[in-house]
Amino acid sequence: MSSSVTSTKYVLNSFNSVPRLSYAKSIDIKDSLTDLIKIQRDSYNAFIGIDQNTESGIKNIFQSMFPIQDLLGRAVLEFVSYSIGEPQYDEYECIKRGITFSVPIRIVLRFIVWKVQEVSFKEVKYVVDEETSEKSIKYIKEQEVSIGDLPTMTSHGTFIINGIERVIVSQMHRSPGVFFDSDKGKTYSSGKLIYSARIIPYRGSWLDFEFDIKDILYFRIDRKRKLPVSLLLRALGLSNNDILDTFYDKIRYVKSEKGWVVPFVADRFRGVRLSHDLMDSDGNVLVKANTRITLRMARKLANDGLTKYLVPFNEIQGLFIANDLLDSTGNALIISAGENITSEHINKLELFNIEEIFVLNIDFLTVGPYILNTLFLDKNVSYEDALFEIYKVLRSGESPSLDTIKAFFDGLFFEKERYDLSTVGRIKLNDHLGLNVSEDITVLTKDDIIHVIKKLVLLRDGEGSVDDIDHLGNRRVRSVGEFIENQFRIGILRLERMIMDYMSSVNFDNAMPCDFVNPKVLATVLKDFFSSSQLSQFMDQTNPLSEVTHKRRLSALGPGGLTRERAGFEVRDVHPTHYGRICPIETPEGQNIGLISSLAIYARINKHGFIESPYRKVDKGVVTDKVEYLLAMQESNYYIADASATLDENNQFVDDMLYCRHDGNFVMVKREEVDYIDVSPKQIVSVAASLIPFLENNDANRALMGSNMQRQAVPLLKADAPLIGTGMESIVAAGSGTVVLAKRGGIVHRVDGLYIVIRAFDQEKNEYLGVDIYNLRKFQRSNHNTCINQRPLVKPGDYVKANDVIADGSAIDQGELALGKNVLVAFMSWQGYNFEDSIVISSEVVKKDVFTSIHIEEFECVVRDTTLGPEKIMRSVPDINEDSLSHLDDVGIVNVGAEVSAGDILVGKVTPRPPVSLPPETKLLVTIFGEKVFDCVDSSLYLPLDVEGTVVDVHVFVRRGVEENDRSLLIKQNEINGFIKERDYEIDVVSEYFYDELKRVLVSSGVQYNNQNIDDYLASIPKKEWWDINLSDEAMLLQVKDLKEKFDSMIQNAHSKFDQKIDKLNYGYDLPQGVLCIVKVFVAVKHNLQPGDKMAGRHGNKGVISRIVPVEDMPYLEDGTPVDIILNSLGVPSRMNVGQILETHLGWASVNLGKKIGHILDNLDELTVSHLRNFLYQVYDGQDLKDNIQSMSDEDLLVFAERLRDGVPMAAPVFEGPKDSQISNLLRLADLDVSGQVDLYDGRIGEKFDRKVTVGYIYMLKLHHLVDDKIHARSVGPYGLVTQQPLGGKSHFGGQRFGEMECWALQAYGAAYTLQEMLTVKSDDIVGRVKIYESIIKGDSNFECGIPESFNVMVKELRSLCLDVALKQDKDFLSNEVKD
């Protein structure tokens, strides 16, 4: 397929982001970047099928499974059609309820029972219809049957399983087909290459072929014991003669008076040293003996007319006879096929007067005797013996009949039920072996196996080369649709077996199709896959970029893939075919490095699972706009130029010679020979890496860290798009699913914090399309506890086009990805507080909540029905004073908006307890004072100790059939009010449009009523009565009638949707067994920046905040502006991520240009708009936007300039960033020093630093490694079973490890007692820590240290090595040692 290259024009409106000053030279193919999760969506759609007419995975599975008939053939169950229903609840309702977002699958089955005369164990005699001569039907029953629910993909490419969003990661695995390989000389010390071949199916047994050190060819099935390949060939039905005929050419030798006359073939004499004179058939010597003949010499002899040459009688000794040689009677065998001709055989030839023989073309140079040698290992084995030998290896211990063995062998490779190459495997096999077998034949054929052996023998003979398994032509991607299809097939096969079993025992007369199908079978298989598969992963929802990246991830791990322990360096390494397909940068840093990767920006996956990359076609040195997608295998045949190649105004290459990629190498070719050119310099990298400006100036390791850390950035309180971006920010935001995109074009009717209502309207056709209502997500919790909050960008009256961003999400600013903040940074050391990547920040940053983030914590309270009675939610909790309950409502549930802190009750709950007998004095007090005695215990939901925040939402789920409490009813009523609001919005928009249209029609009719103008008359009556006005014009009457029908239909549709929502709400909740009610409380926690939090830039420059310095102590500029962050300049040279410095300089220019524009705007009394326009010309010099600025009105120009006050947004695309001279020009334009350095003053003493400092604006991110989530305290806690040392980590409530270096520190300062305390009682001295506990209770501060348990463990380990070590504590023992 091909697409075209396009560019866009900026449109000034309130909801578009400010255009970036871009340094990109290439033109993007925008249509390839509009849908970043197309891979997931297309794969799933291919599985379910858009409609019944298209081929789909589901349809193919049903067609392959049915018809099913019983064992005796009395009845058959046929598949007619399938249908996929609508989900019961929408995506967010499923998340809220904690259920799976799924659709019901129903199939129409036809059950046919035949009329039978007689049934026996061997056969069934049917009643035959006399007219059609076919079996008579007793009856047919057709019914629609449910086979279960299928988890369905959300609009964002995810799955919601039990209320949790999950992603099915695509898997890279070895493509089905045949692969040829060698051991690279590693198996044997001699270094001899051992060649092998492997046929890998999509489903079924693997077939391996391999040589041994003696050049005998063997085969294996499923990696079992190897057998000679001649056994396999005989099992395929080939005799010895057939095998020799198949693998060797024959040479005819005709006897003459002077010797044997042989046809002369020039290629057979290449590199041969003659053992005898080369003579023609007449005996003339052409070449003397011992001469080495070259191919050129041989071909000259052929051209000179040599067609036959003479071989002396004795020179045939050592050749191999091609077939069985019989005497003239045909009874006596002289020489067997394949035998080596000896002197004895030559005498026999003379004796029997043999005039003609055929020998095998084996010269030991270009053709070796490998198949022949293998054949002689088991020369006399028959077809039956071969089958039995193969069966014995695969199924040892069994001795079945020959028919069973044949059926078993056929099922291994030749039956669709047990073996499937898949279409991909067949295509690869055909390409590799040069076959022309139909793609529909997805099992092996005899020819396939023979051709694989032939090619393997050719490899051993030195022809051809082995395959590169890491080449992307040999690896394919399995996406979500394929995984679900495989699981679906497993479930359906289980269902088929159950149907077969049921058919054998059911009475057909009473059976219906629904009796055969158990819907739980399929549901169980799908549930297991989505819940526990290695490739079904909890979605990374930290920020929009992490969502997109997770959906575009490729994993080599998982079922059928590699394991991280066995994966070598080669499979992890970057391969030349990854160019434009898999990102060479983005991969994890740990043990999964290279095994998990990301798809490149423009790459797509074709229907066979291979990755394609786009290129622009080049025709005779001219670059066209036609874009073609190429596979890795296709790409190696072409010369492909780099996107940075210089073009003239006619799109022709300027240079005569260009560097091009060809077959994995870089070569210099003429421009006329170039076939394609890259579409963009950034097509090599992934989405995350494409967001790093000046990527080309960073070391690859740091770029890897930068792309990974962007995915860890926490969405901040107020999003701020980067001043220095790459131009990909808006594309990533739109493709993430976090923003709200307009489904259709139209006019914004109403906007508030919860809804956007758009009157969908086609401006070109002037056609009304309906009403689109968008519900905005407010303060919802993501998978990683970050806050999802959508904010509208549009205002009433705005006209939006389809796919315009109408509402921002978390970490989105004006439709652009905004993961961090633009902050003023100085590169310098400061009192040692930024040593080793530590970061010093200003208190002003904390005060202004620059890096403050909101996190949503979810707490759940479950009310159960116990054996003593039901638990209850109530406000009057035992032994809790009223002040502690002030934030609860009358029911006992916390109010939304309440500020809660550690230990506060969120839900008051009591649990019944067994009755206790009260002592007499208590009974007396109860009688006198009437005190209530609680027969229950407090089991309320308390806020954990480390949480403090504001309650933002409460969900109450009451079991269907259980009486709802007041809070539950209130929440339900609020939801109903929301539905009413939506319905009324829709009716208002529909009514407004249709009444306007009706009025237009009535006014155009020109009629008058009661001598009134039509406008006045319409204003005097209710709008409902407008429809009843009589019109004399028939055409207008029909027009009004048509409007009325459309109006009624849309109003009815709005009411119908409202009723459906109410029905679903009133349906109630299905809760687990024994659960009466579930209350979920969501608390918004505010995390301010503090020491210990981790921050990073986009260039891998990460660090931990060491100190928050008062703003008055921070270094400041000449104008008094204090810097926000101080970074250590020593962190740049060794890391080689210079991109951060270039970003700093460009950011410095950007902000100061904004200040200059702001100064012009503030002084418009003195300066004119033309002055502003001229300055913007200089800023956007050479940009497409320059034309837009020229065409803007003065009013629009002022609006546009106002948005540039905080800085001019710039784009430095990957590999197309601005040059040093361009950055210098911008600094000069902003009246700055071109060095990018300024004088800084010490905030503590006010003196200027000795030398200038690099200062500028850099985009910093706050990562989700927050100190609040990591720090914890331990007094007592769990200990390890063996070592008896405290466990580690917050989740285990562990201690802090006092490690080797810490021990050195104590030793260095002579703190012996402190060191002893650390290694014993505070660690694993079991007796000592019990004693110290006792002494604390007694108030005694003294303690003794004993023997740590780790010493005892060491002693035990020494004993296991037969070394008995004992610890003596007796004083006499020491004195005896001294005496000795």
From Swiss-Prot:
Catalytic activity: RNA(n) + a ribonucleoside 5'-triphosphate = RNA(n+1) + diphosphate
Keywords from the UniProt entry: DNA-directed RNA polymerase, Nucleotidyltransferase, Transcription, Transferase
Annotated EC: 2.7.7.6
One Gene Ontology term, aspect cellular component: DNA-directed RNA polymerase complex
Pfam families attached to this UniProt entry: RNA_pol_Rpb2_1 (PF04563), RNA_pol_Rpb2_2 (PF04561), RNA_pol_Rpb2_3 (PF04565), RNA_pol_Rpb2_45 (PF10385), RNA_pol_Rpb2_6 (PF00562), RNA_pol_Rpb2_7 (PF04560)
InterPro entries reported in the protein's UniProt record: DNA-dir_RNA_pol_bsu_ext_1_sf, DNA-dir_RNA_pol_bsu_external_1, DNA-dir_RNA_pol_su2, DNA-dir_RNAP_su2_dom, DNA-dir_RNAP_su2_hyb_sf, RNA_pol_bsu_bac, RNA_pol_bsu_CS, RNA_pol_bsu_protrusion
Family: Belongs to the RNA polymerase beta chain family.
Self-association and partners: The RNAP catalytic core consists of 2 alpha, 1 beta, 1 beta' and 1 omega subunit. When a sigma factor is associated with the core the holoenzyme is formed, which can initiate transcription.
Name of the featured protein: DNA-directed RNA polymerase subunit beta
Species of provenance: Ehrlichia chaffeensis (strain ATCC CRL-10679 / Arkansas)
Gene that encodes it: rpoB
